[in-house]
Amino acid sequence: MLNIVVVFPKKEIVLKMKNVLIKNGFDVSAVCVTGAQAIQAVERLEAGVVVCGIRFADMIYNELKECIPDTFEMVVIASNAQWQEYGDDDVIYLPLPLKAYDLVDTVSDLLTDIHRRLKRE
């Protein structure tokens, strides 16, 4: 089963992102406010997408990326200024202000790609 994990440092942002995804037909497996919580959540899951901000209280997104398995893809949502400071090309970046359809389309495409990849293996 493919999963979605949402990780942002503020609970209200996590819940907004979760609600956008749920309203568009996705199941959200976990919501987290720290990188450590996200790592614990991902360890229980097989594959999917991590939707996150660029920085958490305990780490930044690329530290989280190093801790998640290759069966997960990452979508980072951040301002252009944050991306200039911390970003790299190893993940998918969506700029703020975020359009809901950009998030939905990106997550949908990634889940489709992961599903195909897992079927081949």
Predicted regions mapped to residue ranges:
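Short, structured coil segments at secondary-structure junctions
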Residues: 25, 70-71, 87-89
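Alpha4 helix (beta4-alpha4-beta5 surface) of REC/receiver domains from two-component response regulators
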Residues: 63, 78-96, 105
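Conserved phosphotransfer microenvironments
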Residues: 35, 48-69, 79-82
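C-terminal output helix
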Residues: 98-111, 115, 119
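Two-component/phosphorelay signaling modules centered on CheY-like receiver
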Residues: 11-30
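Acidic, metal-coordinating helix/loop segments flanking the phosphotransfer/catalytic sites
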Residues: 31-49
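Conserved acidic carboxylate
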Residues: 8
